[in-house]
Amino acid sequence: MSAYIIETLIKILILVAVFSALGGFATYIERKVLAYFQRRLGPCYVGPFGLLQVAADGIKLFTKEDIIPQGANKFIFTLAPIIAMVSAFVSMAPIPFFPNFTLFGYEIKPLISDINIGFLFFLAVGSAGIYAPILAGLASNNKYSLIGSARATIQLLSFEVVSTLTILAPLMVVGSLSLVEINHYQSGGFLDWLVFKQPLAFVLFLIASYAELNRTPFDLLEHEAEIVAGYCTEYSGLKWGMFFLAEYAHLFAFSFVISIVFFGGFNAWGFIPGGIAILIKAGFFVFLSMWVRATYPHVRPDQLMNMCWKIMLPLALLNIVLTGIVILI
């Protein structure tokens, strides 16, 4: 029992350290990608190819003054970014990032908890992060923060419904909520990937994921031209950095989950080993989010809600019905 606890604690430390570092590095990659699309250079002065820009940004965040606005609720103002970080990293617990491997004669499972309701746990804990923008907006004593938190409540709750209903169809096909079982279901090869059996579910879940992640063109929670930085307007320094890292941690988590559910996960991909294959797939979806950000303009709140409730929700329900009919036949 003690060995299991020690192993779990080590896995948690590795997960937090690795994805925190990746979150910082992803800022550099995203700025370079956006610069390429916009015919700019991007970061290029700090270190070779601008690689040390990440370190410079980190030093800036850690040394900035932590300002709490006058009239703000200090406890809730501080609690909000902690909730964002905790929900982002805890939601990764049931995600199998790689195949099992042996180290010094000991089999290592590269996930924190192999529970049979892994996907439900991922959605539930990830959606708990909605309290972060709500509390941040309410505690900041700022009108723009309050508008941002109101938008967060509407947008995240709406798309949480869509993403949950959308994923029911693939889960009906597999017959399990375990992400490990979903991965094993697609072990037969390329044609067993669920994206070919549930293409509509994949498209709907991808769009809903970007909306839940607050990625452009769905970043209504912090749209600079309308509400400054939304619920983050009054945050600075380390607290703002925690919101920032939480957003990227959610992006990585959703990228891995989409790769596992629809694209064969860590099963070997031809001559490519499974561990490398899932990194390629997840990396592609991280890049795709940056590509979408550089390509599409913002949508209006009313357009987003119309798309959610009048288009995506009926399509998700229709897909569930059709999948059930096919399974019965």
Curated annotation (Swiss-Prot):
It is a multi-pass membrane protein. Keywords: Cell inner membrane, Cell membrane, Membrane, NAD, Quinone, Translocase, Transmembrane, Transmembrane helix, Ubiquinone. It catalyses: a quinone + NADH + 5 H(+)(in) = a quinol + NAD(+) + 4 H(+)(out). HAMAP family: NDH1_NuoH. It is an enzyme of class 7 (translocase). NDH-1 shuttles electrons from NADH, via FMN and iron-sulfur (Fe-S) centers, to quinones in the respiratory chain. The immediate electron acceptor for the enzyme in this species is believed to be ubiquinone. Couples the redox reaction to proton translocation (for every two electrons transferred, four hydrogen ions are translocated across the cytoplasmic membrane), and thus conserves the redox energy in a proton gradient. This subunit may bind ubiquinone. NDH-1 is composed of 14 different subunits. Subunits NuoA, H, J, K, L, M, N constitute the membrane sector of the complex. It is found in: Cell inner membrane. The gene is nuoH. It holds the Pfam family NADHdh. Its main location: membrane. The chain crosses the membrane at residues 9-29, 42-62, 75-95, 117-137, 154-174, 188-208, 238-258, 269-291, 309-329. GO terms for molecular function: NADH dehydrogenase activity; oxidoreductase activity, acting on NAD(P)H, quinone or similar compound as acceptor; quinone binding. PANTHER family: NADH DEHYDROGENASE SUBUNIT 1, NADH-UBIQUINONE OXIDOREDUCTASE CHAIN 1. Belongs to the complex I subunit 1 family. GO terms for biological process: aerobic respiration. This is NADH-quinone oxidoreductase subunit H. The keyword S-adenosyl-L-methionine does not apply. Its EC number is 7.1.1.-. It comes from the Bacteria. One of its GO terms (cellular component) is plasma membrane.
